[in-house]
């Protein structure tokens, strides 16, 4: 069993704050946010109360559920093409079971889009795998330092990636930084540096992990013209003109933690106060046990459930008549509380850009829990919303894949940004198709559109393709008499 050291801090406060923000979101998206919810609960309520609540309830995570609902761009594998003059050169790269297909690039992009929407940025490291295939490795921003020149703020020229490595002799794990630096284009750098806990570089380990010095003329990542490049692609959820936009949707993140806090309290009520409790007065409760002796949360209590009767003994200091009765249940109307939490969750999802009216309800009961399952029309809207910004990153990734394959695998793929990506939209439902047909027919009857425009709208074709389809339909009617 290995001892994994804590992740080192980054050298400046601005980067460290960004990293901590991104790390919380990553944990919420990956499902490892239990300790974060526990800390949030303890900041909301007194420790003595927290001790009675039991385990946390992580069933509600509006932030992650909303990101998952919006990440639909790669639900179907996109189509990639090139101009005719590049077709023969690009065919081994883009064809079925070609180099890009074997790398599982678009399958990986499903996870990349999911995390990009939540964290607002994602990094993709393009490399060659041990099996001599292209490798697209997603890296979350909380493990990366990057900066870009003021004149080109979306194109980084220096990137550090924190990576955990092992000393094969001592078997100890330690943190390193893979450094890619193009600030001096005449002297590009690729290094592996050992990182101290305060983020300072203490030792150059390039000879051990890279096999030698990779600076200057030895820099390995160059295109067919010999120009150095960074083997990285930065994906953005929205183009803001900045390299990082880490604090957008912060209200949704904190609100999701708050909603989970409400569900933890609801669980506590269900388990501990969903029944009327019997009691007596002027007597002492027998069988009390002390918990947390000597701690801040020390308390005396006894287990009870709906079938229990609490036993008391006479109070020697009180001669009054004992009384027997019961308290009303603390949770008298769970539906009212669930409805209030559901309204709160809907407001959070609307802040993510999900229209509550477009969400498909799992149950017709308005008190039912909130489930984010968008309609097909809203899913297509989400695809259109993200298609342009992700197309920029996808083209860069495919171009980088071609450059690295040419450099290290001896291929000859096009290195120019000539790749065209067509994302496959979610098909219309039968109801939507019927409404579309009726709308097109009405417009044609009113003389608002012609036959070519109608075919374009119905089948999503270009004008030339629509004309050709109309000719085919006319020929078939003549031939078959229909």
Segments (PLM) and residue ranges:
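Extended, helix-rich architectural segments
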Residues: 1-158
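Residue-level preference for well-ordered alpha-helical positions
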Residues: 71, 349, 402-406, 442-446, ...
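Surface-exposed loop-to-helix/strand elements on domain peripheries
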Residues: 84, 89-94, 313-435, 470-473, ...
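Extended, regular secondary-structure scaffolds
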Residues: 111-118, 123-245
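Short coil/turn segments at secondary-structure boundaries
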Residues: 112, 126-129, 272-279, 358-364, ...
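Amphipathic alpha-helical protein-protein interaction segments
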Residues: 120-127, 334, 443, 453-457
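Extended, charged amphipathic alpha-helical segments
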Residues: 212-373, 424, 428
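Charged substrate- and nucleic-acid-binding regions of tRNA-handling and nucleotidyl-transfer enzymes
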Residues: 431-481
């Amino acid at each position: 069993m290995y001892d994994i050291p804590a992740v080192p801090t980054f050298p400046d406060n601005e980067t460290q704050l960004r990293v901590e923000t991104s790390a919380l979101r990553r944990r919420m998206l990956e499902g490892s946010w239990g300790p974060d919810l526990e800390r949030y609960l303890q900041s909301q309520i007194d420790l003595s109360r927290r001790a009675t609540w039991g385990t946390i309830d992580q069933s509600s995570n509006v932030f992650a559920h909303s990101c998952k609902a919006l990440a639909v761009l790669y639900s179907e594998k996109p189509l990639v093409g090139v101009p005719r003059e590049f077709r023969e050169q690009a065919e081994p790269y883009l064809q079925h079971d070609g180099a890009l297909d074997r790398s599982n690039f678009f399958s990986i992009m499903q996870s990349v889009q999911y995390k990009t929407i939540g964290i607002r940025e994602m990094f993709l490291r393009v490399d060659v795998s041990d099996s001599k295939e292209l490798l697209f490795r997603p890296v979350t921003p909380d493990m990366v330092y990057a900066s870009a020149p003021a004149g080109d703020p979306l194109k980084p020229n220096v990137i550090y990636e924190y990576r955990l490595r092992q000393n094969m002799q001592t078997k100890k794990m330690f943190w390193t930084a893979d450094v890619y630096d193009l600030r001096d284009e005449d002297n590009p750098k690729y290094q592996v540096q050992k990182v101290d806990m305060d983020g300072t570089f203490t030792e150059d380990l390039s000879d051990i992990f890279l096999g030698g010095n990779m600076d200057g003329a030895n820099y390995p990542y160059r295109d067919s013209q010999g120009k150095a490049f960074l083997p990285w692609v930065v994906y953005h959820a929205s183009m803001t003109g900045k390299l990082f936009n880490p604090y957008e949707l912060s209200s949704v993140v904190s609100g999701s933690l708050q909603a989970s806090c409400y569900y933890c309290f609801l669980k506590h009520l269900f388990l501990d106060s969903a029944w009327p409790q019997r009691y007596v007065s002027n007597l002492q409760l027998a069988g009390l046990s002390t918990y947390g002796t000597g701690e801040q949360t020390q308390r005396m209590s006894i287990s009870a459930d709906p079938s229990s009767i609490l036993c008391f003994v006479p109070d020697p200091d009180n001669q009054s008549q004992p009384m027997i009765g019961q308290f009303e249940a603390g949770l008298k109307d769970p539906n009212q509380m669930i409805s209030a939490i559901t309204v709160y969750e809907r407001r959070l999802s609307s802040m993510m850009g999900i229209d509550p009216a477009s969400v498909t309800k799992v149950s017709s009961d308005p008190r039912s829990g909130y489930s984010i399952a968008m309609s097909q029309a809203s899913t297509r809207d989400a695809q259109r919303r993200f298609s342009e910004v992700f197309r920029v990153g996808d083209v860069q990734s495919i171009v980088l894949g071609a450059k690295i394959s040419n450099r290290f695998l001896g291929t000859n793929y096009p290195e120019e940004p000539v790749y065209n990506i067509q994302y496959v939209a979610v098909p219309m439902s039968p109801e939507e198709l019927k409404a579309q047909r009726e709308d097109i027919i009405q417009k044609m009857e009113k003389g608002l559109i012609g036959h070519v425009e109608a075919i374009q709208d119905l089948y999503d074709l270009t004008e030339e393709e629509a004309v050709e389809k109309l000719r085919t339909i006319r020929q078939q009617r003549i031939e078959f008499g229909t």
